[in-house]
Amino acid sequence: MTFVESMQRRAVLAQKRLVLPEACEQRTLEAARLIVFRNIAAKVFLVGCERDIKNTADRCGIDLTDMVVIDPSVSKHRDQFAERYFQKRKHKGISLAQAAEDMRDPLRFAAMMLDQGHADAMVAGAENTTARVLRAGLTIIGTLPSVKTASSCFVMDTNNPRLGGTRGLFIFSDCAVIPTPTAEQLADIACSAAESCRTFIGEEPTVALLSYSTKGSGGDSDENILRVREAVRILHERRVDFTFDGELQLDAALVPKITEKKAPHSPITGKVNTLVFPDLSSGNIGYKLVQRLSDADAYGPFLQGFAKPLSDLSRGCSVEDIVAACAVTLVQSNGR
């Protein structure tokens, strides 16, 4: 069973509610039809102009049976959501009138549905930019109490258990959101990646914070090393509930014999299934190298660290990409 198949199966069992704010888009509607057909969600909310959604569905021959269309401009929740949004943003100088206008936007309205418990998961990005999706998430939903940083991860399936990880599966983080994380942000990313490991891989995380240096081999003057080292100190200070170590080079993290030589007292020997990269460049290059130069499958990026589950799509996504992202995001909502 592939990772996507396992996520869809788990979503069927979880039976959570999904909100889709790009419901005037043909791919979104086709994905919603498949989600209903496969029973992946308990309920599917389509947010947008009702007339435009139905026109798109009619033009494309998509049956909207068993889906709920919500038009923000006439929704019974519009005033309540506008007031809530105003309370969240008034420190930025927003007026109640502007809040009401902003709540006409399907993306913001869907995010508020998620925030207020009317849905369990949100997926967007087929039309909206990543920046807009992240902004809606951060301004309306916010991050988990335990972290201050929203980030992302990939699930990497190397299709080769001999390479390590958990049955050949790894979490790579952060590969899509924060260009140059601070030490505090790196610690947050490690915590979120550990939770993603539990959610997606189903095993206890063993986290390696990566660097070009292993335990001081690169000296003590480079800020890039010091940030990772400080992140490790912060994790110790937080008394996190997962095994971790750093700073470590990749081979010292993954190859037990090299770990024993370069970091003989490391608690992670032979057990790493979660890799935290020092910056976005290394993370993005790293996952693409593994994907393109081996027989690995890369799934993601999946957002992590938000108070409620939401996912960002590539604007070039296929219908099945949307279905997969929805299944993953619904699985993230299970247990929250």
Swiss-Prot record:
An example Pfam family from this entry, by short name, is PTA_PTB
Which pathway is it part of?
Metabolic intermediate biosynthesis; acetyl-CoA biosynthesis; acetyl-CoA from acetate: step 2/2
Q: Which residues fall in a coiled-coil region? A: none
Just give the chief location class.
Answer: cytoplasm
Q: Which InterPro entries match?
A: P_Ac_Bu_trans, P_AcTrfase, P_AcTrfase_dom1, P_AcTrfase_dom2, Phos_Acetyltrans/Butyryltrans, PTA_PTB
Q: What is its EC number?
A: 2.3.1.8
Q: State the compartments where it is located.
A: Cytoplasm
Q: Which SUPFAM superfamilies match?
A: Isocitrate/Isopropylmalate dehydrogenase-like (SSF53659)
Family, according to the entry, reads as follows: Belongs to the phosphate acetyltransferase and butyryltransferase family.
What name does the UniProt record give this protein?
Answer: Phosphate acetyltransferase
Species in which this protein is naturally found: Treponema pallidum (strain Nichols)
Lineage at the top is: Bacteria, Pseudomonadati, Spirochaetota, Spirochaetia, Spirochaetales
Q: Gene of origin?
A: pta
